[in-house]
Amino acid sequence: MKILRLQDLIAAGQVAGQRVFIRADLNVPQDDAGHITEDTRIRASIPCIEMALKAGAAVMVTSHLGRPTEGEFKPEDSLAPVAARMGELMGREIPVIANWTDGVEVAPGQLVMLENCRLNKGEKKNNEALAQKMAALCDIFVHDAFGTAHRAEASTYGIAQFAKIACAGPLLAAEIDAISLALANPKRPLVAIVAGSKVSTKLTILKALSANVDGLIVGGGIANTFLLAAGLSIGKSLAEPDLVGEARAVIDAMKARGAAVPIPVDVVCAKTFSPTAEATVKAATDVADDDLILDIGPQTAAILAAQLKAAGTIVWNGPVGVFEFDAFAHGTETLARAIAESDAFSIAGGGDTLAAIAKYGIEKDVGYISTGGGAFLEVLEGKTLPAFEILTKRAAG
């Protein structure tokens, strides 16, 4: 994927004295009092901003925050707490500018934060007049918000159409590189883990991956539907019986390519869904009518761990059991540690996956951790994200 990168423009001396508009993802969680409870996204966006400032640019940064009503400002929708936190981290005052679409005064070496872009009428519908106004504010537009790369909005897509120069910031560029490594040109064997409660929410991903991967590991409620497709009983476990045909089609598609969806040989069951429930390991053929399957068994975990250690590339989306309950966390932990020990290039994404990575402290052993959420899932579905599409188009002239 050929895109223009901010670091390339800086290296070519094209950024000094220019007005740079950065679309970041600063959509951080806040408590009821408006205090930021988790600042990873703010920290992740600072390298791009500092890069532009060091190069001598006049820098404007904006983001969405929450779900405000367009055209109606409410104090809780303001980026002021974000600017304050970013200012603490960067050791500088960051003024917040409201009603900014008609013009912003910013000098080289200066940084301002443009108020919540979703307050602008026409933002979400990618209104052309709004996008042109935004583009007129800058000489260079920098997209550095992978979390919004799957949305075609005025501040993510429209501005990139009309700005003099449109490029990717370091965060977005890293996502593009990791995705290309994992999916476009993977080192084989390519093994994917797709887990979650429902086949219905991940069906497009399962179908897309079944045409490309060498091994497709399913987990969570999704695996229960695949157990049904393999003719096994799952007791009262969470599953979608109406999607058994779809699961079978995925198994058949993999088989036709000489690949496989490994079906668990043993599972961990309980009688109730509770952190204190008694865990019992059973053969997958011995599940009782009143059993709930809450994890893969140790034998299955060992087989899958060996497959992951032998992989060339690993794509991981979702924990394979109820890892929040320690009695049902063994499967997820075993696979997480196998990914950490594997020589494969690994890319992981999705909220629960990130929580599992944090729980087992393997952040440094995963090749790339995607913070994209919905954008990451759309990439796995084989879709071309609007942000990638417009930046590629602009790079091609």
Curated annotation (Swiss-Prot):
Broad enzyme group: transferase
Cited Gene3D superfamilies: Phosphoglycerate kinase, N-terminal domain
Name of the protein in its database record: Phosphoglycerate kinase
Species lineage: Bacteria, Pseudomonadati, Pseudomonadota, Betaproteobacteria, Burkholderiales
Binding site for ATP: K202, E324, G350, G351, D352, T353
Subcellular location: Cytoplasm
Quaternary structure (record): Monomer.
KW Nucleotide-binding (keyword) present: yes
UniProt organism field: Leptothrix cholodnii (strain ATCC 51168 / LMG 8142 / SP-6)
EC number, UniProt record: 2.7.2.3
The organism's place on the tree of life at top rank: Bacteria
Catalytic activity: (2R)-3-phosphoglycerate + ATP = (2R)-3-phospho-glyceroyl phosphate + ADP
GO CC entries: cytosol
Gene Ontology terms describing biological process: gluconeogenesis; glycolytic process
GO terms of molecular function: ADP binding; ATP binding; phosphoglycerate kinase activity
Residues annotated for substrate binding in this entry: D25, L26, N27, R41, H64, L65, G66, R67, R118, R151
Family statement drawn from the similarity comment of this UniProt entry: Belongs to the phosphoglycerate kinase family.
Annotated keywords: ATP-binding, Cytoplasm, Glycolysis, Kinase, Nucleotide-binding, Transferase
Name of one Pfam family that matches: PGK
Pathway(s) it belongs to: Carbohydrate degradation; glycolysis; pyruvate from D-glyceraldehyde 3-phosphate: step 2/5
